[in-house]
Amino acid sequence: MSKAKLDPGAGVRGAIRGAASHLVLAVVCLSAGAGLAWTVGRRPALDAVTTHGEWVYLRQPGSPDSVRAYGAYPERKDKAPGVIVIHEIFGLTDWEPTVVDRLAKSGYVAIVPDLLSSRFGRSPADPDSGRKLVAQLEPARVTGDLNAAFAYLDSLPAVRKGDIGVIGFCWGGTQSFRYATDNPDLRAAVVCYGQPPDSAALARIRAPILGVYAENDARTDASLPDVAARLKALGKAFTYEIYPGTGHGFLKPGRQGSDGPQVERAWGNILAFFKDKLGG
């Protein structure tokens, strides 16, 4: 897959302009009302919001490879901010589209690309197989596929141009942190229990970053004080919280703490962060 070269001076839009013209709309409309079911902590206020979801295929200029993605839109009269969702190390599962729907119900046009699809066709149903395939992804390919998602959102008439953020979980949290070093046009990044990039790369970050971490996840949390100090020294906006009584991946059903109060508290903080940085 050909990659768009990022030029921090010109910005990603210049580097990947025209990507939207290579978009193939696939187009199975999945929701015209409630969307996919949100399985944890759903609130009545969210249920009242009408959303529409569809599968699309994104393509970068000059490449035969396409990226399968699920997107959802809120029904609103004005333009909305956009959010890219990055899946876990297991590939795209049934859970990530529910995250997209939750964001749409909160007023965002959101999309989750299947980052295995441009190379392997789509994510496998078996988590172990997905993990093995994710391990084979080159960082440049992941960045290119995320650029395609960014360009797609930025081209939509329903999205306020430029008001785009990213959120990732587990491996996706690591990619969210890394993508903030590669895309100077991002307005906000949320890292859910992800590892930071190397110290030199941190200097390239422009977007404010919110970190969501679990108390019982020492392997991931160990570097946080040093990373926070480094980003503060660089003048970067980075805040994080470690949620008590939770384990790695706690925002996903079935993980330690996923049925406790910290899930809704974390989501409240995530949505407040996006509203502050991207607008409502």
Where are these regions (language model features)?
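Gly/Ala-rich beta-loop-alpha elbow adjacent to hydrolase catalytic centers
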Residues: 168-172, 176
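An N-terminal hydrophobic leader/cap segment in hydrolases
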Residues: 15-59, 67-68
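Serine-hydrolase catalytic machinery in alpha/beta-hydrolase-like enzymes
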Residues: 46-49, 55-155, 250-254
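Acidic catalytic loop of the alpha/beta-hydrolase fold
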Residues: 216-221
